[in-house]
A protein has these predicted regions:
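Class I (Rossmann-like) S-adenosyl-L-methionine-dependent methyltransferase catalytic domain
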Residues: 1-39, 49-52, 65-100, 104-114, ...
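Generic beta-sheet signal
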Residues: 40-42, 119
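Class I SAM-dependent methyltransferase "Motif I" SAM/SAH-binding loop
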Residues: 43-50, 126
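Gly/Ala-rich phosphate-binding loop of Rossmann-like dinucleotide-binding domains
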Residues: 57-58
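Conserved acetyl-CoA-binding loop of GNAT-fold acetyltransferases
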Residues: 61
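A short SAM/SAH-binding and catalytic strip from SAM-dependent methyltransferases
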Residues: 107-111, 118-134
Length: 215
């Protein structure tokens, strides 16, 4: 997908369709059970201005995020009253504050030394934001960035793709296994289906979807 799609989406809408209004219930329910320690460095790829990041921060974690849109990160810092410094780090812009490191720019420009303290990944909206043609590259780059032993907590959705065009895109359990089974032991924490899982996607024509949390 072209960068302009995401830049325009953030500029045109105060509440983009993928932006959730509350913390993800799978995160609330399963984060501790997934094996997360009390204080970790957590990487949130394609983070936008997700409220999940604030919850992770308030839970004692240092949050490292990246999003293509500098607008999204500026809005997030303003909304959460984060007094961040802003500087260039190679091809990326970085916002820094106690407990926060937020990069603005292309995910594929990140380098391993920028994530060398990460022990856990929280992916709620990164993999499903990408079309199938980009997901293998995303997974490969993510694995190359992470220190050995890093755990991945991911939330994916599966739906009838004749009813709606992504993003967010449908990612099957089989595809997720194919992308991440090498080097990771994947455990399904919860998988639920039904119209009650739709949230704001009901307005786009979906009648049901399955949401799965894995670690």
């Amino acid at each position: 997908m072209k960068h302009e799609f995401w830049h325009n989406a953030w500029k045109k809408s105060e509440q983009p369709g993928w932006q959730q209004k509350s913390v993800n219930p799978h995160l609330l329910k399963h984060w501790s059970a997934s094996g997360a320690a009390e204080s970790e460095v957590v990487f949130v790829p394609l983070c936008g201005r997700s409220l999940d990041m604030q919850w992770l921060h308030e839970s004692g974690h240092h949050v490292i995020g990246i999003d293509l849109s500098v607008t999204a990160l500026e809005q997030f810092c303003e909304q959460q009253s984060i007094d961040a410094t802003c500087e260039r780090d190679g091809p990326l812009t970085v916002f820094r504050a106690p407990g926060w490191t937020l990069y603005a720019g292309d995910f594929f420009k990140l380098e391993p030394d920028q994530l060398n303290r990460v022990s856990r990944v929280y992916d709620r909206a990164a993999l499903i934001a990408l079309p199938e043609s980009m997901r293998a590259d995303y997974a490969r780059h993510l694995r190359n960035l992470l220190p050995s032993g890093t755990e991945i907590f991911a939330i994916t959705i599966t739906y009838d793709e004749t009813q709606m065009d992504g993003p967010p895109f449908s990612v099957s359990e089989a595809e997720f296994q194919e992308l991440f089974s090498s080097g990771y032991e994947i455990r399904v924490l919860q998988s639920e289906s039904g119209p009650e899982q739709l949230g704001n996607l009901a307005a786009r024509g979906l009648t049901t979807l399955r949401e799965t949390a894995t670690c």
